[in-house]
Amino acid sequence: MSAALPFDVPVTGQEIAWKPFANYQGFVYKILNVDVARRNVDMVLRFEPDSVCFYHRHWGPVASLVLEGEHHLQEVHADGSKVTKVRRQGEYTVSTGNHAHIEGGGPHGGTIFFSFRSDQDHIYDILDDKLAVVHEVTVQDFRDSLDNWSLDN
């Protein structure tokens, strides 16, 4: 049996120090790793059944892996058209992240690993229902949150 690496983090089960995301309901998250110099963020989100997060738009590629349940995604394109996708446990995808979308869990919820990459400090924008930017989220925001993770619990 190999020794655990210092960055090994379990992602399922009750032992996880999940956190709610601000005042949003229906999902919690755990930041796994932040590399400010490379502008990389790895995290896991756990959605309650049939819940969604908020509209947002990424500034770079996003890799996702459905660990448990389903990942439901509704993309909103520039022409206003919407495309709904359902990803099931074990599905891995890489997207450009360049269009607005909202995502959540399926009828039994969902636990999804995300890996964000960017060529700038800006990782994603939180959008309102009209897709206007409400807040810009940076790699440093993630770093600060991870650095203070145990202090907040």
Please name every model-derived segment:
Residues 1-39, 83-85, 128-153:
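A short, N-terminal "cap"/entry segment at the start of jelly-roll beta-barrel domains
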Residues 30-45, 112, 116:
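Short, contiguous, helix-prone interaction/anchoring segments in small proteins
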Residues 31-38, 49-61:
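Active-site region of the double-stranded beta-helix
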Residues 36, 77-106:
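Short acidic-glycine-tyrosine-enriched beta hairpin
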Residues 45, 54-57, 61-66, 84-85, ...:
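His/acidic/aromatic-lined binding-pocket segments of jelly-roll/cupin-type domains
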Residues 49, 58-78:
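Glycine- and acidic-residue-biased ligand/ion/polar-headgroup-sensing regions
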Residues 51-54, 72-73, 91-103, 120-122:
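Histidine-centered metal-chelating micro-motifs
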Residues 94, 107-124:
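A short hydrophobic beta-strand segment most commonly corresponding to one strand
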